[in-house]
Regions:
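C-terminal catalytic "cap/lid" subdomain
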Residues: 1-296
Length: 296
């Protein structure tokens, strides 16, 4: 589901719920790094910027690239989230700084995902508009009575702002980073060039958790637990059991597979690690391993 909603009032309401769950963990002295989805937000920004350019008869404005749209979504979602967390903590008598970092994530230009795009973005287009997009080298797919653009979802390779994230953690701050999977970039000499892609947030969360050497990775979603293909709830399982379930195609490739696969990657990358997948409201109970899907 979309974690933050499609309108600004809906987002305000949902970030308050997220802030309450996070504050529960802070009260128990957990050190926290937060990443988040940018669900429809990045697509809405891209649609708005594209429409603005299309309606500008004087051609003073151009379409914003996906990397820029991703940066915008990181900024405004992070702004709402950090202020909601700050307020919730102060209401509980806790002073703890919260900072948002606009985060660039390196992707491999040869990642096979660029040849098999999966993420649908933007508004519905006419056949003529879709043809124009394809002439630019973009991919489109049919949707309803029209067409929409589809972009790649490569895996994260490195996080450029990791030193800044760790410095803030060492200073006792709560850090919001790599929102929406981070801004996908490629190295070109000394330049970081934005890629026309959206990184799957679950994989970036696992990469970030690994790089800061976290003990736990929590993926908070709309489900209390993951389920097998025949609807059986998945509780505490080993990495090998999780891999077997992946190999047996128990998870949807777009929605649940990345969560389980990213959890396996994180737990397998270090000693004594645990991944938890559960509902946002269950964050505290989840980290105590009382509820949710626990992989360790």
């Amino acid at each position: 589901r979309n974690a933050f909603g499609e309108t600004f009032p809906e987002q305000k309401k949902n970030v308050k719920k997220a802030a309450q769950a996070i504050a529960d963990l802070v009260e128990q002295k957990y050190q926290i790094v937060i990443t988040h989805s940018n669900g429809p937000q990045v697509g809405m920004i891209q649609t708005a910027m594209t429409e603005f350019a299309r309606l500008d008869n004087d051609k003073n404005y151009t379409v914003a690239p996906m990397s820029l749209c991703g940066a915008m979504s990181e900024g405004y979602i992070g702004y709402d989230l950090q202020n909601a967390i700050r307020t919730e903590l102060l209401d509980r008598g806790i002073f703890k700084p919260v900072s948002t970092i606009i985060t660039q994530v390196r992707v491999d230009p040869f990642d096979k995902a660029f040849n098999h795009p999966t993420k649908v973005i933007g508004r519905v287009m006419t056949r003529e508009e879709a043809d124009a997009e394809e002439e630019k080298g973009n991919h489109v797919v049919p949707e309803g009575d029209g067409f929409r653009r589809i972009i790649a979802s490569p895996k994260p390779v490195d996080i450029y702002e990791i030193d800044a994230i760790e410095a803030l953690l060492d200073a006792g701050q709560i850090v919001i980073a790599a929102g929406g999977g981070g801004i996908p970039v490629m190295e070109q000499g000394t330049t970081l060039k934005g890629a026309s892609a959206v990184i799957e947030k679950d994989y970036t969360a696992a990469k970030l958790a690994d790089m800061v050497d976290a003990s736990h990775l929590m993926i908070l979603t709309s489900k209390e637990q993951m389920e097998t293909a025949d609807g059986q709830a998945i509780g505490k399982i080993s990495v090998s059991d999780a891999i077997s379930l992946i190999d047996e195609n128990h998870f949807d490739a777009i929605t649940t597979l990345p969560k389980v696969d990213a959890s396996v990657s994180f737990v397998s990358s270090g000693e004594g690690r645990t991944a938890i997948i559960t509902k946002l409201e269950n964050a505290y109970q989840g980290i105590k391993e009382r509820i949710g899907t626990i992989i360790k």
